[in-house]
């Protein structure tokens, strides 16, 4: 059983590694900083024409990205470049050196961190609901935005893994102070890798002191956080002359001829974050690429968090629910809430492992209803990943699947991706204690799938015109599915009592 469980996660990791997604401004902004650091500078003047995700300061270009991912990758890239391996692989594969480098660095900076995250989710899921850790991890890895972004050299995979690892360290710390300090260190480096992870680091800190001995544990955790953000402070000091000058400052809005015609991309509010808007929050959840629209399984996760609270894991459920709310509120106040070319609201990715904590209890309580929303989530995520997630800002990826073009090279290069995902699902099914479906199970799955289809159709049409009607439909559908399961549960207890 343990071997099949690990193989299920390994199959997903191989699925991530089987695709190379090419360039894009975000990936190339990270890559430009990696290359600059190998030459001992943070200035990306030599590469500024490759990307628009830049800042301009004292007549020089800088990547507007947090430097944590580049810190991890600078050593491997230096070896690849100086050894001539990049040139050799480029000649062998026929791809450009940049494409080869993005794929290899993506393995280190995105694929491996996501694999570690899934292992952590498996372990925590099994603690919360024995036997349901593997399906928790596989659902998170195949049916949420973690899937496409595990194949891209963005900072989300690394920072999200670090943020959740900080929680796991504190969660298992018991009476020892060292795990609290290590949790703080990991949480601090998550901030160094993606600034909004301060929300996760702060929330995990509150969770740490809620476990008792608040002063000692809080101090150990805080000391770790300081050490974790120290590389960021040193980088800012050396690059910009001040430890408090973040790369978000002086971000370029429009490049123009000079490359910095208009500055101030993040000047509104605090680095682009101002007063949250309810309409933006609705868009983040229910628009054409809203979180619920493209990955409806998160609704099952949210319900699972409520069930987790009721089962006695109250601190953990409160942490997860609070983080989800915090990220939606923060993102609803951000100037570019969807973050450009993306298959969904990518700035919400750091909260997804915490939503996934609810998958274990959801599968335990309502297995087939959860499967009913997990399947379309996985199909959509597989589709956008196979057709390049950066191009999935609309649902035109469906056309690229149906016409067989995918990313322009046809279906054959994408077959390993699909095979590995299917293999992972099959192995996961073998180790998960969910029996064969009965008639009522099939009805439950169809009810949840039908509810999703209604929301997927109505949501994008009502989100900007009649949000109250959308909310009423969503609540009614949720109540209907819930009442069905409550009725089944009571009916089962009545039959057991009469027997």
Regions found by a protein language model. Name each.
Residues 1-499:
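Membrane-proximal envelope and lipid/glycan-remodeling enzymes
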């Amino acid at each position: 059983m343990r071997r099949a469980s690990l193989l299920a996660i390994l199959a997903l990791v191989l699925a991530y590694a089987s695709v190379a997604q090419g360039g894009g401004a975000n990936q190339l902004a990270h890559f430009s900083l990696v290359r600059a650091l190998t030459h001992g500078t943070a200035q990306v003047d030599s590469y500024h024409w490759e990307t628009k995700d830049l800042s301009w300061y004292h007549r020089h270009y800088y990547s507007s990205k947090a430097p944590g991912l580049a810190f991890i990758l600078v050593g491997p890239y230096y070896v690849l470049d100086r050894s001539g391996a990049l040139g050799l692989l480029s000649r062998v594969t026929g791809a450009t050196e940049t494409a080869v480098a993005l794929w290899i660095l993506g393995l280190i900076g995105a694929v491996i961190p996501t694999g570690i995250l899934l292992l952590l989710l498996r372990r925590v899921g099994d603690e919360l609901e024995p036997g349901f850790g593997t399906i928790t991890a596989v659902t998170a890895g195949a049916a949420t935005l973690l899937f496409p972004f595990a194949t891209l050299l963005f900072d989300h995979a690394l920072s999200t893994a670090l943020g959740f690892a900080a929680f796991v360290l504190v969660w298992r710390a018991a009476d020892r102070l060292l795990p609290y300090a290590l949790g703080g260190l990991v949480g601090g480096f998550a901030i160094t890798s993606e600034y909004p992870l301060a929300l996760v680091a702060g929330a995990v800190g509150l969770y740490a002191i809620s476990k008792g001995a608040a002063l000692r544990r809080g101090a150990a955790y805080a000391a770790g956080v300081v050490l974790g953000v120290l590389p960021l402070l040193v980088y800012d000091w050396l690059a910009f002359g001040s430890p408090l000058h973040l790369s978000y400052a002086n971000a370029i809005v429009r490049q123009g001829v000079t490359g910095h015609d208009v500055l101030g991309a993040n000047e509104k509010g605090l680095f682009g974050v101002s007063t949250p808007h309810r309409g933006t929050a609705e868009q983040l959840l229910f628009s054409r690429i809203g979180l619920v629209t493209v990955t409806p399984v998160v609704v099952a996760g949210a319900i699972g968090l409520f069930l987790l609270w009721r089962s006695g894991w109250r601190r953990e459920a409160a942490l997860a629910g609070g983080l989800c709310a915090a990220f939606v509120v923060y993102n609803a106040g951000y100037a570019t809430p969807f973050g450009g070319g993306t298959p969904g609201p990518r700035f919400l990715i750091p909260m997804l492992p915490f939503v996934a904590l609810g998958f274990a209890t959801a599968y335990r309580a309502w297995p087939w209803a959860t499967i009913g929303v997990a399947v379309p989530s996985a199909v959509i995520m597989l589709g956008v990943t196979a057709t390049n997630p950066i191009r999935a800002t609309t649902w035109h990826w469906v056309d690229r699947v149906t016409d067989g073009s995918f990313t322009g090279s046809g279906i054959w290069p994408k077959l390993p991706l699909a095979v590995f995902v299917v293999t992972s699902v099959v192995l996961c099914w073998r180790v998960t204690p969910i029996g064969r479906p009965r008639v009522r199970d099939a009805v439950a799955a169809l009810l949840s799938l039908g509810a999703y289809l209604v929301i997927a159709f109505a949501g994008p049409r009502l989100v900007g015109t009649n949000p109250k009607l959308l909310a009423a439909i969503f609540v009614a559908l949720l109540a209907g599915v819930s009442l069905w399961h409550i009725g089944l549960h009571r009916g089962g207890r009545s039959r057991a009592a009469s027997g």
